[in-house]
């Protein structure tokens, strides 16, 4: 009888521990992984080395490439134009980037009214964009400061006010293309062929030749 009561108490205690553990899990909800990724992706990485990519942005509507000429931004550059070459610098571990014109040295930015402008300094959040790869394989660029505002151009290559843009519009769709012009750093130098350099023969080499002829 004593053994049965002891076993009953043991089983009851075991179920009590399991019940307490289940209640603890209910009180502590599982972490939101998507929210964590979103928060970490919105922080600027100040420690890691910047990764710089070089390409052109082909506008789906204008059929031309994005260019930054001083303060003005348009999508009217031909393929291979020096102003169409862009340096795309990573800002975080995610898909946030800064876009800089290789020829003008200006950054692609968006002001309070949603107008695209070129600025010499691209440290502000208005000069940071999130690359969004769409289902149709096009890329959309959403401004980091103004959520829901995208880079967009008309058929004539003129910038559209970002407050009137949506992700599913053709005007915000771009294709990344390699630049046909000369390669920037670190590929500025073209591959060189090996050159054979002739050195004058040393005294020891002359002695060896005399020894071979004598033998």
Swiss-Prot record:
It is found in: Secreted. Keywords: Developmental protein, Differentiation, Glycoprotein, Growth factor, Mitogen, Neurogenesis, Secreted, Signal. GO terms for biological process: anterior/posterior pattern specification; fibroblast growth factor receptor signaling pathway; mesoderm development; negative regulation of endodermal cell fate specification; nervous system development; neurogenesis; positive regulation of cell division; positive regulation of cell population proliferation. Coiled coil: none annotated. Glycans are attached at residue 137. It comes from the Eukaryota. Residues 1-22 form the signal peptide. InterPro entries: Fibroblast_GF_fam (IPR002209), IL1/FGF (IPR008996). One of its GO terms (molecular function) is growth factor activity. GO terms for cellular component: cytoplasm; extracellular space. The keyword Secreted applies. Gene3D superfamilies: 2.80.10.50. Disulfide bonds: none annotated. Pfam families: FGF. Belongs to the heparin-binding growth factors family. Involved in dorsal-ventral embryonic patterning, by promoting expression of bone morphogenetic protein (BMP) antagonists such as chd. Also involved in anterior-posterior neural patterning and in mesoderm induction. This is Fibroblast growth factor 17. It comes from Danio rerio.
């Amino acid at each position: 009888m004593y053994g049965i009561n002891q076993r009953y108490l043991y089983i009851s205690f075991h179920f009590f521990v399991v019940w307490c553990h289940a209640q603890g899990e209910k009180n502590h909800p599982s972490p939101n992984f998507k929210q964590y990724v979103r928060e970490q992706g919105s922080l600027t990485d100040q420690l890691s080395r910047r990764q710089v990519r070089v390409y052109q942005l082909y506008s789906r509507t204008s059929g031309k490439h994005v260019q930054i000429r001083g303060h003005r931004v348009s999508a009217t550059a031909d393929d291979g134009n020096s102003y169409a070459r862009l340096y795309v610098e990573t800002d975080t571990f995610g898909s946030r980037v800064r876009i800089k014109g290789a020829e003008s040295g200006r950054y692609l930015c968006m002001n309070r009214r949603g107008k695209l402008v070129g600025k010499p300094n691209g440290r502000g959040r208005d000069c940071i964009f999130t690359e969004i790869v769409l289902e149709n394989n096009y890329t959309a660029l959403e401004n980091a400061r103004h959520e829901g505002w995208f880079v967009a151009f008309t058929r004539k290559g003129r910038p559209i006010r970002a407050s009137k843009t949506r992700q599913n519009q053709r005007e915000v769709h771009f294709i990344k293309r390699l630049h046909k012009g000369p390669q920037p750093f670190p590929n500025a130098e073209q591959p060189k062929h090996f050159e054979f350099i002739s050195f004058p023969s040393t005294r020891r080499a002359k002695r060896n030749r005399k020894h071979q002829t004598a033998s």
